[in-house]
Amino acid sequence: MQWTAAFGSLARLVSRGDAFVTYVPPAPSIVDDIIAQVKFDANGLISALAQAPDGVVLMLAWMNADALRETLLTGRVCYWSRSRQKLWRKGETSGQQQKLIEARLDCDMDAVLMIVDQTGVACHTGRRSCFYHGVTPDGLRDTSQPEISAEELYGR
């Protein structure tokens, strides 16, 4: 489909250290067709996984139809904040934006994987990834340290 970049090409670009593939948004009518095929849950949401081009999973969030539409049309990742009940444009307050490189829907059409160009860190704790609690035989262990403090990240 025209709305995704070729993953093989992306992998070659990343391995050479070249610039990322530029996301080319589909026409609004194609975005509407894609969204019509998505199976949103009873709350009108799908899970949205953000992954860096090197394969690191950055975060898991939620999207409603409006967030998915905005993301696909603009290439700037937008989520749905369940706690604030409003659109959450990643990096709006912190500057830690995500630019879409590629989007893929899963086989059930109820989850989206986004390969993103992450500015700064993805996690509100100041870490690159939100997935830093490693499970060990002795319990949980932090697998990474913050790259930036919350005070620096949010100016608090």
From Swiss-Prot:
Binding site for Mg(2+): 106, 108, 110
Stored SUPFAM superfamilies: HisI-like (SSF141734)
Gene Ontology MF: a single term: magnesium ion binding
Pathway: Amino-acid biosynthesis; L-histidine biosynthesis; L-histidine from 5-phospho-alpha-D-ribose 1-diphosphate: step 3/9
Domain of life: Bacteria
Needed co-factor(s): Mg(2+); Zn(2+)
Cofactor note: Binds 1 Mg(2+) ion per subunit. Binds 1 zinc ion per subunit.
Positions annotated to bind Zn(2+): 107, 123, 130
Catalytic EC class: hydrolase
Reactions accelerated catalytically: 1-(5-phospho-beta-D-ribosyl)-5'-AMP + H2O = 1-(5-phospho-beta-D-ribosyl)-5-[(5-phospho-beta-D-ribosylamino)methylideneamino]imidazole-4-carboxamide
Any one Gene Ontology cellular component term annotated for this protein: cytoplasm
Enzyme Commission code: 3.5.4.19
Chief location: cytoplasm
InterPro entries tied to this protein: PRA-CH, PRib_AMP_CycHydrolase_dom, PRib_AMP_CycHydrolase_sf
GO terms of biological process kind: L-histidine biosynthetic process
Keywords: Amino-acid biosynthesis, Cytoplasm, Histidine biosynthesis, Hydrolase, Magnesium, Metal-binding, Zinc
Subcellular localization, as worded in the UniProt entry: Cytoplasm
Record has Amino-acid biosynthesis as a keyword: yes
Assembly and oligomerization: Homodimer.
UniProt xrefs under PANTHER family: HISTIDINE BIOSYNTHESIS BIFUNCTIONAL PROTEIN, HISTIDINE BIOSYNTHESIS BIFUNCTIONAL PROTEIN HIS7
Entry similarity comment: Belongs to the PRA-CH family.
Purpose of the protein: Catalyzes the hydrolysis of the adenine ring of phosphoribosyl-AMP.
Family annotation (HAMAP family): HisI (MF_01021)
Protein name (record): Phosphoribosyl-AMP cyclohydrolase
UniProt source species: Gluconobacter oxydans (strain 621H)
